């Protein structure tokens, strides 16, 4: 369709519907809030004159219909990550569609494809972020400089392992448990070499795995009245926290058993 039409025909309506669903999926799988996904999709539908549009979003799925139930679509979103650059790009596209700056579905589809292709930060940036975050958290929790250095090394190792898991499709609880175990092992070895306590380094480095976003968004969903999505996110956060505890506890228990002393 060359221009935005007041009464798009059936083929155009289907195309608009597919575009809106793709935009919602992009938002949801990159860390946007549930209510924000619904709001953005409704704005796009109204701007493209897709009448009687209704959408219901969960943390892992989108259900939408348009017209008198003549069109309906379901999208499964099993994979969720955090890429706020893509979220911001889709939100900006939504505002431009509403203002008329993006006036055709062709341009909107092109812009959405560009937003979906925004890359993640380079590997060295993620490694540096893990190193800096672990170092700072170790100091915040009362560790000395030696503990901070051990935590920094563990942070690099953890992020390198997470990058490896991402490229080979390793996910779920196993990834979190194994990463927490790797962090604990690296901190114990590093602190033993440097002659300092391992507890501050372990706690500081484990903070980079803490599900803060999932927990915060779960609370926000509850505040918004979406109890189902809030419950799902809270359970997700609790499972991640439990996986972290299992991984760290296994290594510390094994170390204490082998050495005959408690890890401090």
Q: Model-predicted segments: where are they?
A:
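Core alpha-helical transmembrane segments of integral membrane proteins
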Residues: 119-199, 211
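Alpha-helical transmembrane segments and their cytosolic membrane-interface
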Residues: 79-147, 236-245
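Generic detector of multi-pass transmembrane helix bundles and their immediately adjacent loops
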Residues: 190-264
């Amino acid at each position: 369709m060359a221009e935005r039409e007041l009464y798009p025909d059936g083929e155009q309506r289907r195309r608009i519907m597919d575009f809106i669903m793709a935009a919602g999926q992009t938002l949801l799988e990159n860390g946007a809030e549930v209510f924000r996904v619904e709001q953005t999709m409704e704005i796009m539908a109204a701007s493209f004159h897709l009448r009687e549009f209704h959408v219901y979003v969960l943390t892992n799925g989108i259900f939408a219909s348009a017209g008198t139930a003549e069109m309906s679509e379901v999208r499964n979103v099993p994979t969720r990550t955090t890429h706020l650059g893509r979220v911001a790009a889709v939100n900006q596209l939504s505002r431009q569609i509403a203002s008329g700056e993006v006036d055709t579905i062709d341009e909107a589809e092109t812009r959405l494809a560009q937003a979906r292709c925004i890359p993640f930060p380079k590997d060295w940036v993620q490694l540096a972020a893990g190193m800096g975050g672990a170092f700072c958290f170790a100091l915040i929790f009362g560790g000395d400089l030696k503990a901070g250095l051990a935590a920094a090394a563990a942070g690099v190792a953890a992020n390198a392992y997470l990058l490896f898991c991402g490229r080979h499709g390793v996910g779920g609880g196993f990834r979190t448990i194994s990463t927490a175990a790797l962090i604990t092992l690296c901190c114990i070895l590093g602190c033993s070499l440097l002659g300092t306590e391992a507890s501050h380094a372990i706690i500081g480095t484990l903070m980079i795995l803490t599900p803060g976003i999932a927990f915060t968004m779960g609370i926000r969903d509850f505040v918004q009245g979406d109890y189902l999505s809030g419950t799902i996110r809270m359970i997700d956060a609790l499972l991640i926290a439990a996986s972290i505890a299992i991984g760290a506890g296994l290594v510390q228990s094994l170390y204490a058993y082998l050495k005959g002393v408690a890890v401090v």
